[in-house]
Structures are given as C-alpha cells and as structure tokens.
Amino acid sequence: MREIIQEVLPSFNSNKPFALATVTRTWSSAPRPVGAAMAVLESGEVIGSVSGGCVEGAIHEASLEVLKTKTSQSVTYGVSDDNAFAVGLTCGGTIELYIQYVDQSSFPDFADIAAKIEDKKAVAVATLVSAESGIGARIVLTKSDASGSLGNTQLDHAAIEGARALLNHGTTKTLKLGPNGENRMDDV
C-alpha cells in the first residue's frame, strides 16, 4: 500500500470510494511480493500493480464488484485454478489477495496512515482477511501505540506483537493466527 497511498489519498479525501487489492500470500513464482497493492477507483482507473500484469484484468473485475457491493473479499489465482491461464497467470505460481472497500467510514484511519507514511514514520495495518466472522476488522499500529480490534483481546495481542516484530524489521507478511491468537499453520 505504501507505493500507492499518496495517489489514492485525493479520492479518499473527497470521500470517493475505491477498492484496495493487497497481496496476502504467494506460492512458487508469483511476480509481486506480499503487501503489493493495487487500487481501483470508481471511474475504473487502476493505480498500482499486484501481479506485474499477470492477473490485473481479473482483479480489476473483482475490485469493481467490491465497489458495487461494498463487500470485501479474498480471491486466489494460480496454476491449480483451471482459469489461471485465462486470467493471465502464465508466469506460474499462485497469488492470494484481499480486496477491500475503502471510503472514509469504512477505513477512517486511512488518511492518518498516509500522513505517517509521508512523514517516513513506521506504521502497520493488521487486517483480518480470513475467519468465520469479522473479515475486514483491523488494527493500525506504530512502534508505540495501536488502535482498533480484530475481535478479541487475545487475537489483538498476538496480532500486535507479530505486526510490531515485522514493523521493527521493515517487512510485510501474512500472520496465521487462530481465533484466540495462537500461531497456526492454516488460516484462522
């Protein structure tokens, strides 16, 4: 998101919604790393890239659906998907993304995050992208404070601890935590 946040900020500040697609997981030779982001504005304009062009068309369509329904979703494209070649994932590998609906009411911290990034301050966003319920819940954190919740205190504590470790190392990663914050190999 860091790469595109200043370009989408005018839309946010004008309360014009957009869909924000973020790479949450990759396998094999996916073209972009976890954390790569692409925004699709209401006009259909695309800002950023999540796959180096491999599946942008399919993600654009999914993003327009998110804008229409105002419902965030996770999507996966890969070599095991019969439609992978059809959507352009000819480079191999698998890519999983979380596409979220963003406007001033759904993501009120967005402008503050943009300001911190502009000021070169460390900031992280932990978003619940896979769970029985609560998809889209988030915690915004810096090295010294955090706001928001993923749904319960134990999960919040584990997410903050994990995200701070990543923040301190300047890296991005998908944390796999259970509903009570336990580390897991599978999804929540």
Put a short name on every predicted segment.
Residues M1-V188:
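Segments forming oxygen-rich coordination pockets for charged ligands
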